[in-house]
Regions:
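Active-site rim/adjacent substrate-binding subdomains
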Residues: 1-92, 104, 111-113
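Short alpha-helical catalytic segment bearing the HExxH-like zincin motif
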Residues: 92-100
């Protein structure tokens, strides 16, 4: 495994945007009021992504309630672990986006893993 290359904020946001564009249209519509945020706080959260808010039609998930729903995709940890190979990085960004969308749709960790997300 080589050294991860630097990905600018714009380059990484383009990967996230592409992953969102690949979602089924019904999922894209469901996300209209969810903020999608690229962050470099993955190392402190020990994660590639995080959903904060209320599950669709449900109760707060991971401290939500009152704040707008937000999906965070962590550039620092994804680039650190997969940035040496653009194809692997892209695949893991797609997987992370889908995983966090699964949480928004109401699935817990076991549920998204069972779905292969």
């Amino acid at each position: 495994m080589g050294r991860p290359r630097h990905y600018s904020e714009q380059e990484f946001e383009a990967l996230v945007s592409s992953a969102l564009d690949e979602l089924p249209i019904e999922f894209q519509r469901a996300l209209e009021h969810v903020a999608i945020v690229v962050s470099d706080r993955g190392a402190e959260n020990h994660a590639y992504g995080m959903y904060v808010g209320s599950k669709l039609g449900g109760s707060p998930f991971f401290g939500g309630g009152g704040s707008p729903d937000e999906i965070m995709i962590f550039r620092d940890t994804l680039v650190r672990d997969f940035g040496d190979d653009p194809n692997r990085l892209r695949a893991h960004v797609v997987q992370t986006v889908r995983h966090e969308v699964g949480h928004y749709l109401g699935f817990d960790e076991a549920g998204v893993n069972k779905l292969g997300l």
